[in-house]
Amino acid sequence: MFKIINTLLLFAFVLCIHKNATAQQDWKDINTVEEVCTNYTETIENMLDQFNLDYPGLEKVKRDFENGNLVNACYELLEYYKNGNTASDLRKTLPKKTDQTKSETDTILNNVFVVQNVRGKVPYLTNGHRDWYYKGPNNDKEWAWLSNRHSQLNNVFNTYLETGNPKYAQYIDLFLKDFIILGMPYPAVKSSTSVWRGLEVSFRAKVWPKIFYGLLGSDYISPATQLLLLSSLPDHAHYNRNFHSSNNWLTMEISALATVAAYFPEYKNSEEWLDYAIETMTQSMKDQVYADGVQTELSSHYHNVSLHNFELFQEICDRANRKLPDFYNRTIEAMYGYIAHMVRPSGFRVMNNDGDRGSDQNLILKGAKKFGHEDWEYIVTNGQTGRRPEDGPSYFYPWAGHFVSRSDFDRDAHWSFFDMGPWGSGHQHNDKLHLSVSAYGQDFLVDSGRFAYTGEVAEKFRPYAQSSAGHNLLLIDGKGQQNGPRLANKPLGEDHFKIATNFDYASSSFDQFMDLEGSVKHTRVVFYVRGQFWVVVDNIETDRPRRIDALWHWHPENTVVKDRYTVKTLNERGNLTL
């Protein structure tokens, strides 16, 4: 009896020693299949459970896994991917080894990330992992979110392909291992944390497949990291499948779900993920794009974001040989048409709602080529190439309520944007009846744009940017507009606009103001005499005397002076007088 007890105690003691020895292995030193299977047995077993082991080519993986040989099953799985033809468009010819470097990427290798022009160095925790919850030098949660989308990792990946310097691939290996291990276990709940928020999940799910397939034959990416990545991708897909949002967030999250499904058809749930993605994305397009082709958030920036993700989804379905409804392609064409018709003569987009003043020229040229629209090419090249449109030069989108007036299509053309639409389904500003004006390549009257979402700038200026005070509107007794209707339930009728040979006319009203006693209604009429000038008439209907402040925001590059009853610019070329 004494001998038996001693044996049991010795056995227990040996088990404890083995377990502790395993736990003590530094995660950074886990590189081989054997090491990852020993240290993260449950994770790797769960990873293999995510695969359809009856998928053609996985016969050896199934045999070894069912026989309890986890290590061999993982070797066979990696061999399957190395020798397969899945995701042929992502597989890369590995570069020859060099010592070439790129200084910008070397900054990333020091864990210095630039997010929205803010530079921050991600610190290390006591366990040797990077602090993926670090919010940058300004303690900005947006900084942490964006850094966890792994665009910096994509940058390092591209630099490795360009230079062949092993240090870039080695950084990717350790980066992914660090991130995935520290993020375990997957929480499987909707979250707004720095790591597990829907947008960040979706961006990583698009970056990681590029890296996995692009570096499959590399000696600098360890088998352990490859297996950890394969274990985490189903978690990313699960999140985007079950916890996605709506509007443009949905397009990003669902296109990420489809990305994982299309590039990894071996996962058990890939077929269901793709079915769900097609159904959801198709319905989302119907819900968030008006009949005139404008995305319902009514921000040119997020219109482009949605378009990008709709197109990305279309490309994914094409690669997976999955057909989309005809209206899907027609809607994408209409979305391009809106961008082409709204663009300023300079090639920059409208800065409405949460928008940025970015160039749409290349995007429009891409759409023109894709759909054979030489008229769009003509517009965005100021008539240098393409074919002159049979309509225009002014355009009205009745569901969005967006009216653009032009004198012509040349670079010096007059251009104005008049907003008669609803508030928008997201990223809204209280800016109905706002008017922007440009001419001679110069912006004169401008929109506040987005400014920033979080951080010091946002705390100071975000409320102003969203309010009527940040737009070319009227304040009534110092009060701006309340939130208007989110969506249009019908297009604006012909009584609201007219486009004639020599003039444009547009008119709309708004009657909901913040904390204002009594009734008031603001009607704005914009009359543009083509090639000459604009007439803006503001009419106020009210039940009592009011103080009216008319706001006109000039682009800061203008030199503006007041001359008795007029305000005017003193630019060298191209001026505006009010």
Model-identified regions with their sequence ranges:
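Bacterial Sec-dependent N-terminal signal peptides
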Residues: 1-25
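CBM-like, beta-strand-rich accessory domains located in the C-terminal region of large
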Residues: 22-24, 362, 456-458, 462-578
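Extreme N-terminal leader/anchor segments
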Residues: 24-121
